[in-house]
Amino acid sequence: MTIESKNYPPIRRVNASQGSDAAYQILQEDGCVIVEQVICPNIIAKISDDVNRVMDKATIGAKKGEQTHIINMHNRTIHMGDLVLTSKTYRDELLNLPFAHEVLEKVFKKDSGDYWLNMGNILNMLPGAEAQRPHRDDYLYPVSQHMDPATSPDLMINITFPLNEFRHDNGGTLLLPKSHTGPNADFYANAEDLPAAEMQVGDALIFTGKCVHGGGANRSDKPRIGLALAAQPGYLTPRESNVNVPRDIVETMTPLAQRMIGWGTVRTKDTYGLNMLQDKDFHEALGLKSKTA
């Protein structure tokens, strides 16, 4: 798929007060949507404080073995996972955010059944960071390249929360709206020509794994920090494992949040159980406790 025209559609937005149906409708039509005021900025500030305390231990640039040529990972970006252990607010608030789950239910329930996390990740674009090459997140799973994007079920939904303001000049996520139904191929475009998801703290960008996108170049003098929460059908193996989370922490989480991090049985649309233990439900077999929502 060669991207030639610079007359790209705008990234449409709704206010969270308009409801998840309004956001889902645009997501279906464009492959991406900005939802304004979807979460209290104070919640994001608490997560940001937790992240900043350990940011100096995070990976700078690409990890060994990563296919860096696909998305142009470089030494001016910091990637950080392990958010379940890093932030109680992330565990309690973000993993249970009602608006997010309303959208995810609409996307996955009919075609796939239950969903869980692919990963929760911090992407810190430092000053001087170059733009990523436009790409699709679905390419993480090779089967996606044998599927017709226009008719196949979604394999991933990314919900990105800005931890500080997202602008075109500081590396705000660049997207090509309506690209989610185009053919599978390499993508060629001047990333800087794509529209940027400009957002304030408390907003969120939701886009499908089929939507062509990439991190923008940071030409400002301050970092641009985002938290990406990626969800996928429960029949796909997540990128990030949470087996390192101690049981005593897991048992402080809701059943929904536990399932999101892989500590729970998921059901396909045909109700078959996956991630079971001793042929029993995960919680039953382990006697796993949980917190009431």
Curated annotation (Swiss-Prot):
<dbReference type="GO" id="GO:0046872">
    <property type="term" value="F:metal ion binding"/>
</dbReference>
<dbReference type="GO" id="GO:0016114">
    <property type="term" value="P:terpenoid biosynthetic process"/>
</dbReference>
<keyword id="KW-0479">Metal-binding</keyword>
<dbReference type="Pfam" id="PF05721">
    <property type="entry name" value="PhyH"/>
</dbReference>
<keyword id="KW-0223">Dioxygenase</keyword>
<keyword id="KW-0408">Iron</keyword>
<feature type="binding site">
    <location>
        <position position="135"/>
    </location>
    <ligand>
        <name>Fe cation</name>
    </ligand>
</feature>
<dbReference type="GO" id="GO:0051213">
    <property type="term" value="F:dioxygenase activity"/>
</dbReference>
<feature type="binding site">
    <location>
        <position position="213"/>
    </location>
    <ligand>
        <name>Fe cation</name>
    </ligand>
</feature>
<protein>
    <recommendedName>
        <fullName>Dioxygenase andA</fullName>
        <ecNumber>1.14.11.-</ecNumber>
    </recommendedName>
</protein>
<dbReference type="InterPro" id="IPR051961">
    <property type="entry name" value="Fungal_Metabolite_Diox"/>
</dbReference>
<comment type="similarity">
    <text>Belongs to the PhyH family.</text>
</comment>
<comment type="pathway">
    <text>Secondary metabolite biosynthesis; terpenoid biosynthesis.</text>
</comment>
<comment type="subunit">
    <text>Homodimer.</text>
</comment>
<keyword id="KW-0560">Oxidoreductase</keyword>
<comment type="function">
    <text>Dioxygenase; part of the gene cluster that mediates the biosynthesis of anditomin, a fungal meroterpenoid. The first step of the pathway is the synthesis of 3,5-dimethylorsellinic acid (DMOA) by the polyketide synthase andM. DMOA is then converted to the phthalide compound 5,7-dihydroxy-4,6-dimethylphthalide (DHDMP) by the cytochrome P450 monooxygenase andK, which is further prenylated by the prenyltransferase andD to yield farnesyl-DHDMP. Further epoxidation by the FAD-dependent monooxygenase andE leads to epoxyfarnesyl-DHDMP.</text>
</comment>
<dbReference type="InterPro" id="IPR008775">
    <property type="entry name" value="Phytyl_CoA_dOase-like"/>
</dbReference>
<feature type="binding site">
    <location>
        <position position="137"/>
    </location>
    <ligand>
        <name>Fe cation</name>
    </ligand>
</feature>
